[in-house]
Curated annotation (Swiss-Prot):
GO cellular component: endoplasmic reticulum membrane; Golgi membrane
Lineage: Eukaryota, Metazoa, Chordata, Craniata, Vertebrata
Annotated function: Regulates ADAM17 protease, a sheddase of the epidermal growth factor (EGF) receptor ligands and TNF, thereby plays a role in sleep, cell survival, proliferation, migration and inflammation. Does not exhibit any protease activity on its own.
In-chain residues carrying the UniProt-annotated modification Phosphoserine: S76, S176, S391
Membrane topology: Multi-pass membrane protein
Gene Ontology molecular function, alphabetical: growth factor binding
UniProt name for this protein: Inactive rhomboid protein 1
Keywords of this entry: Endoplasmic reticulum, Glycoprotein, Golgi apparatus, Growth factor binding, Membrane, Phosphoprotein, Protein transport, Transmembrane, Transmembrane helix, Transport
Gene of this entry: Rhbdf1
């Protein structure tokens, strides 16, 4: 048996190449005490070398003494609320959450407001500023290595970034050239624990790409005018998994055996992987071998270290040495070909099936983070950071993460759906900027045809009319409060109706309720009580007011006029009679005639007129077949629609302040809002989150509508004009908060100011409310200072932020309370205010907003 072992050993020695030398480090006896500063190693895969055979090594875990858990008091509800409120407003003492928000803010600022200062660019490590730095990471704590593995501790990552991999012979400028590894082909322990290592970001295994995602990618490529094949990265052979030369296992938790262990940015990783051939280390051709042997320069060949400047340009890690080539049967080892290898990067988790197909799709949907102050508007206005930014501010920018714009998507869906339904139900009004007139011959209440004219304001937004928008929920003061002018107008009309009577034609062909002046004395009889003998009695006396066509307290059964519920003397307070006892044979002229006119609510100011149905339909009014007097109907309830008033005499639809934010004047108006939301609003929501943006959006819109209802009470206004200008105010606040880190803040300010002034000038057109713009902008400015966290430039800024939150919240509440008082208790009548929101270039360019303008 021993002889067979000697034969086997000699056979192995004969097969061993002469150049192969095995240097196995001696095992150092375990020390009596393990170093306390070492970090325990959780996974044994980190101690396995790729260049050595994979053996099962047992690493003893460090001994931990059992510790008793410290008793802690449960946090009180007051402290929890206080801490949560501080975190929400961005004034928490938790440095992690504060730095995370501040880093995100600066990153957003770099995309929106232009170039940063030079010192910021040098110190800031953003994805858009890819500079190779060997001193960008901190030194990770060393891993705990068991006693049996102490002989393999010195494994140096040649190009690992950070102070953990610098030697004592660093140059004076703080940089040093990378050292070659002691064990070629081995994975460095520090590579796995470094913050720059790909092992800290192990991706989970994903499912194969769905048909829907591939269809969406193809549609996106066609929209961009590209071919579907151009949308993917070029590959050698199309396969759903990476060849075995990268990694042998399909799915690994941590790398046990790696050929290479150097990693770079994820973007470079996928880009490089997709361009490699199937086999990275292919055998060169004979002609290529001859050329390599003749090459005079051997510095850049296999095994040679790249120059530092070339490394910084490529941003890639050095590949490790190729393995030894198998000896030919001739007995001599074939010369190692000097092949310049591509700078490859292998993912720590290993390639997976479907990776080559998923890479272009991820690039298609990839979105860069929004640097604080440099969002979409910042890119349009060429904003940049300063050259120097404090490291504390820089960390705040880096820690910021983008939010998902849920509120923007929900708002866009609601706006689109409501606009489509409104146009489909109420139709489209005449398109234009002036007034549209319609003339036709219509049967009037006297029984003859007359030429009448209907005037309607044109809508250049391609949408419904003003009456339809009011019925849908537009901002309209007479529907939100008891307007003094409208109420006085209704009372005056009732006073005239109180002295009216039924005008009966002599041939009994018809009758209508009218005044004495409108009733012909030759062709008709004006049945006026108590002069006419048909006057009934009330408490022993003749009634002084009446008669009413087709209504008499003596013949009405429901509701009956019986003591103690007799109908009052004033006919404007009579109820609607739903059932008569005698029909048309009462021997009373005002009851036996054919009525030709009933109440019709015309216009948007509560005007009621007793007329024929044909005329009411032509004027697009609300005809009341059941009533005989205008006092028996409530026209404002018909005009406003929605929920009925609690008191028919007092409108109370205050919810129009926020309901109108979801309505639009037309299709074009909705498209403008959608474009604004998908650009500016979506960009800001990524910065602040949906809850903050929703608060600013809704409160700014409500404040803008409230101011518009005060100064333009008789104008129907829809759309989120105040909300959009409140969002524009957020851009100004973001600019002010990032003023210290921008290279040219004044230029960015004037560009943004020019955009806002242009939008204010655009508000001088009809159907656009500048009062909502101004009030929404001012309220949005206050709310942004209160609810938008920002970059902190020191401890003083933290206290300033707390004072800022309290002050601006108090100012906004004061502004809102003042507007509420003006609207409900001290109405303001401003005759020149309409010129601020619409300049009448012609007589018919602007709609007349005064009360008497629409009365025909």
């Amino acid at each position: 048996m021993s002889e067979a072992r000697r034969d086997s050993t000699s056979s192995l020695q004969r097969k061993k190449p002469p150049w192969l030398k095995l240097d196995i480090p001696a095992v150092v006896p375990p020390a009596a005490e393990e170093p306390s500063f070492l970090q325990p190693l959780r996974r044994q895969a980190f101690l396995r070398s790729v260049s050595m055979p994979a053996e099962t090594a047992r690493v003893p875990s460090p001994h931990h003494e059992p510790r008793r858990l410290a008793l802690q008091r449960q946090t009180s509800i007051t402290q929890t609320i206080r801490r949560g409120t501080a975190d929400w407003f961005g004034v928490s003492k938790d440095s992690d959450s504060t730095q995370k928000w501040q880093r995100k803010s600066i990153r957003h600022c770099s995309q929106r407001y232009g170039k940063l200062k030079p010192q910021v660019i040098r110190e800031l490590d953003l994805p858009s500023q890819d500079n190779v730095s060997l001193t960008s990471t901190e030194t990770p704590p060393p891993l705990y290595v068991g006693p049996c593995q102490l002989g393999m501790q010195k494994i140096i990552d040649p190009l690992a970034r950070g102070r953990a991999f610098r030697m004592a012979d660093d140059t004076a400028d703080g940089l040093s050239a990378p050292h070659t590894p002691v064990t070629p082909g081995a994975a460095s322990l520090c590579s796995f624990s470094s913050s720059r290592s790909g092992f800290n970001r192990l991706p989970r295994r994903r499912k194969r790409e769905s048909v829907a995602k591939m269809s969406f990618r193809a549609a996106a490529a066609l929209v961009k005018g590209r071919s579907i094949r151009d949308g993917t990265l070029r590959r050698g052979q199309r396969r759903s998994f990476t060849p075995a030369s990268f990694l042998e296992e399909d799915m690994v938790d941590f790398p046990d055996e790696l050929d290479t262990s150097f990693f770079a940015r994820e973007g470079v990783l996928h880009e490089e992987l997709s361009t490699y051939p199937d086999e990275v280390f292919e055998s060169p051709s004979e002609a290529a071998l001859k050329d390599w042997e003749k090459a005079p320069d051997q510095a850049d060949l296999t095994g040679g270290a790249l120059d530092r400047s070339e490394l910084e340009r490529s941003h890639l890690m050095l590949p490790l040495e190729r393995g030894w080539r198998k000896q030919k049967e001739g007995g001599t080892l074939a010369p190692q070909p000097k092949v310049r290898l591509r700078q490859e990067v292998v993912s720590a988790a290993g390639p997976r099936r479907g990776q080559r197909i998923a890479v272009p799709v991820r690039k298609l949907f990839a979105r860069e983070k929004r640097p604080y102050g440099l969002g979409m508007v910042g890119r349009l206005t060429n904003r940049t950071y300063r050259k120097r930014i404090d490291s504390y501010v820089k960390r705040q920018i880096e820690d910021m993460d983008d939010h998902r714009p849920f509120f923007t998507y929900w708002l866009t869906f609601v706006h689109s759906l409501v606009t489509i339904l409104a146009v489909c139900i109420y139709g489209i009004a005449p398109v234009g900027f002036s007034q549209h007139e319609t003339v036709d011959s219509v049967l009037r209440k006297r029984g003859v045809y007359e030429n009448v004219k209907y005037v309607q304001q044109e809508n250049f937004w391609i949408g419904p009319s003003s009456e339809a928008l009011i019925h849908l929920g537009a901002k309209f003061s007479p529907c939100m409060r008891q307007d003094p002018q409208v109420h006085n107008f209704i009372l005056a009309a009732r006073e005239r109706e109180k002295h009216s009577a039924c005008c009966v034609r002599n041939d009994r062909s018809g009758c209508v309720q009218t005044s004495k002046e409108e009733c012909s004395s030759t062709l008709a009889v004006w049945v006026k009580w108590p002069v006419h003998p048909s006057a009934p009695d009330l408490a022993g006396n003749k009634r002084q007011f009446g008669s009413v066509c087709h209504q008499d307290p003596r013949v009405c059964d429901e509701p009956s006029s019986e003591d103690p519920h007799e109908w009052p003397e004033d006919i404007t307070k009579w109820p609607i009679c739903t059932k008569n006892s005698a029909g048309n044979h009462t021997n009373h002229p005002h009851m036996d005639c054919v009525i030709t006119g009933r109440p019709c609510c015309i216009g948007t100011k509560g005007r009621c007129e007793i007329t024929s149905r044909e005329y009411c339909d032509f004027m697009k009014g609300y005809f009341h077949e059941e009533a005989t007097l205008c006092s028996q109907v409530h026209c404002m309830d018909d005009v406003c629609g929605l929920l009925p008033f609690l008191n028919p005499e007092v409108p109370d639809q205050f919810y129009r302040l926020w309901l109108s934010l979801f309505l639009h004047a037309g299709i074009l108006h909705c498209l403008v809002s959608v474009c604004f939301q998908m650009t500016v609003l979506r960009d800001l929501e990524k910065l602040a989150g949906w809850h903050r943006i929703a608060i600013i959006y809704l409160l700014s819109g409500v404040t803008g509508n409230l101011a518009s209802a005060i100064f333009l009470p008789y104008r129907a206004e829809v759309g989120p004009a105040g909300s959009q200008f409140g969002i524009l105010a957020c851009l100004f606040v973001e600019l002010f908060q990032s003023w210290q880190i921008l290279a040219r803040p004044w230029r960015a300010f004037f560009k943004l100011l020019a955009v806002v002034l242009f939008l204010f000038a655009f508000g001088l057109l009809p159907w656009i409310d500048n009062f909502a713009h101004i009030s929404g902008f001012v309220s949005g400015l206050f709310l942004s200072f209160a609810f938008l966290p920002y970059i902190s430039f020191g401890k003083f800024d933290l206290y300033r932020k707390r004072c800022q939150i309290i002050i601006f919240q108090a100012v906004f509440l004061g502004l809102l309370a003042g507007l509420v008082v003006l609207f409900y208790f001290y109405p303001v009548r401003c005759e020149w205010c309409e010129f601020l929101t619409c300049i009448p270039f012609t007589d018919k360019f602007c709609e007349k907003y005064e009360l008497d303008a629409q009365l025909h």
